[in-house]
Amino acid sequence: MGGYPRTVAVRGARRVPAITFHFWAVKILTTAMGEALSDYLVHTIDPYVAVGIGGLGFVVALAIQFAMRRYIAPSYWFAVSMVAVFGTMCADAAHIELRIPYTLSTVICAAGLTGVFAVWYLFERTLSIHSVNTWRREAFYWAAVLATFAMGTAAGDMSAYTMHLGWLASGLMFTVIFAIPMVARRVLGLGEVIAFWFAYIITRPLGASYADWLGVPHSLGGLNFGRGTVAVGLTVAIVVWVTYLAISKIDVEHEGVAQLPVDRSAPAHI
């Protein structure tokens, strides 16, 4: 996605990757892996133990990520992967344990995400991923990421179960929706920040739908490869891709200088 027409340099190492094809590819792989691994753990061991493991992994991954002074591919994508696992568990727990319908949980998660964005913008006056170059901004960023995973999980389950679309049809639908912000940005000039976060949210149900389609039994409309097998395969793919990114540094952008949007006629600009 393109940059802003007006920017100002702000000192501080970028703590997130450049938004390229590699970003979206690995992001979708992590969403699929998070769905498969979460379901595998919850159905294989005690659900409370599984959630505990997911929560511990989430905390450890974020601690490692916040300890980094700049974007490092392995630590960043490890954090995203653990957010994918734990975020899935949180959304599933809301439905299974609290018996919250998928439609309502989607609305609740959307409200939570809106709240995160509102507070983030209130403090930082921007929601741009290009501005994530301080610990506080990164904290808001990860809060938003976790909320997008929870919301995306609920939306994906709603399409598959409540709307009775099934996994493959849901995956195809979300693939089309995922392309909308890119087309809207190129054709209609949709704002970069809105386009980015719209696409980011959709990656969750997109990846999860395909992961479920690959892993669930034939009786549920899947290919029956097994959730564990799918989780392992996706994890291997993520490790290989992230290793390439770490070695090539092809996704490191403007290290040491972050770009913030500037509107000369207004006090702030999203």
Task: Spell out what each predicted region is.
Residues M1-I270:
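Polytopic alpha-helical membrane proteins, predominantly small-molecule transporters/carriers
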